[in-house]
Amino acid sequence: SALEKKISFRPGFPADWTPVSISNGKIGEAQYSLIYTRAKDTATLRIKSERAAGYGFIFEPAFGLGTNILQATRNGAPLEIRADDRPAAQAVRPRMEFPLSGDDTVELRFVPAPEVILPDVPAMTGDLSRGLRLVRSTLAGRDLQLSLEGLWGETYTLEVLNGERVDSATCSFEDIYGKRHDQPLAAKFDGRTLTVEFPRGPEGYGKAEVTLKLK
């Protein structure tokens, strides 16, 4: 906000995205450019700014549920991290705030959690939706629970980053009457990909609950 002299960056990109950059950003009199990169267990933000004296920067990147944030530095010095304590949060979002100096580099270290990458389904204008939907995710102890919607009779394969932290996968489906049926063999995890096989049923989308048991 220009009135508060604060710039906020809250990236929530898929974990497998390449570096993201913003050029010639402007808020009030301040101008800035930034590059955000993410590796397996680190994330780096570099921001260059001009005419930004008195401006603060808020950095809130999103990581998969179960990610353990270790530490953050700004230009080599420790940077305070504030945790996002919302009980219904769909991601881990550490919050860091600092004054802009003209050239700032923030480095964040963490222990990564498994993150699911939805399959890319090419579509043309007018095509009916056929892609898998991730409605929500929750973490209960060591159980990462994924609420999915997919077409009855379809099989979907999802990439799982940091799959070495997953021990097993189980699945259940909800029928048209809202009753849940356990079908543990409908979800298969091979260490890198998760395959979910929706049983045959009526036309349209059905609901599945997949549980990834973490090590």
Predicted regions mapped to residue ranges:
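Charged, long alpha-helical assembly modules
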Residues: 210-212
